[in-house]
Each structure stands twice: as C-alpha cells, then as structure tokens.
C-alpha cells in the first residue's frame, strides 16, 4: 500500500467513523461508507489539508470513491 493510499484511508476512517480495515479502494463514500453530503465536503477539506492541495468544487464532485481520492492526490500532491 502506498503512502498516499494509507493516508487517504486514514482520513476517510477519521472523517466517516469507520474502521480502516473496512475501507476498500473501490468503496463509495456514500453507498458503501454511509457518508452524506456534509461528510463528503468535510472529507474533501481534510484531503486538501493533508496533502496541501486545492480541490476545485467541480473536481470534488467527481471524487466519489476511495480510489478516486487516491488517484487525485497522486496526481496533484506536491512532491
């Protein structure tokens, strides 16, 4: 598991109150992990803080799974 994947899973676990062990990369924040719209906004803000990046609203709306969050972070994280 990559460092970014591990960090994303940790944030998802903290924000959504689920066990890291229950988070799979294909998990949907809403359908599988029980997030509501406020949870997803807070999740995006936590990802922005963790990875020191900005996620525009139109991009944030497209991040609906753990894998999409990992992919976005990998593509936009400052090295």
UniProtKB/Swiss-Prot annotation:
Coiled coil: none annotated. Pathway: Lipid metabolism; fatty acid biosynthesis. 4'-phosphopantetheine is transferred from CoA to a specific serine of apo-ACP by AcpS. This modification is essential for activity because fatty acids are bound in thioester linkage to the sulfhydryl of the prosthetic group. One of its GO terms (biological process) is lipid A biosynthetic process. It comes from the Bacteria. SUPFAM superfamilies: ACP-like (SSF47336). Keywords: Cytoplasm, Fatty acid biosynthesis, Fatty acid metabolism, Lipid biosynthesis, Lipid metabolism, Phosphopantetheine, Phosphoprotein. Residues 2-77 form the Carrier domain. It is found in: Cytoplasm. The keyword Lipid metabolism applies. Carrier of the growing fatty acid chain in fatty acid biosynthesis. Belongs to the acyl carrier protein (ACP) family. This is Acyl carrier protein. It comes from Janthinobacterium sp. (strain Marseille) (Minibacterium massiliensis).
């Amino acid at each position: 598991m990559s460092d970014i994947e591990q960090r994303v899973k940790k944030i998802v676990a903290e924000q959504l109150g689920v066990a890291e062990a229950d988070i799979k990369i294909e998990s949907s924040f809403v359908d599988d992990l029980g997030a509501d719209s406020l949870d997803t906004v807070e999740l995006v803000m936590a990802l922005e803080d963790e990875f020191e990046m900005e996620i525009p609203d139109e991009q944030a709306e497209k991040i609906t799974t753990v894998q999409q969050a990992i992919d976005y972070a990998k593509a936009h994280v400052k090295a």
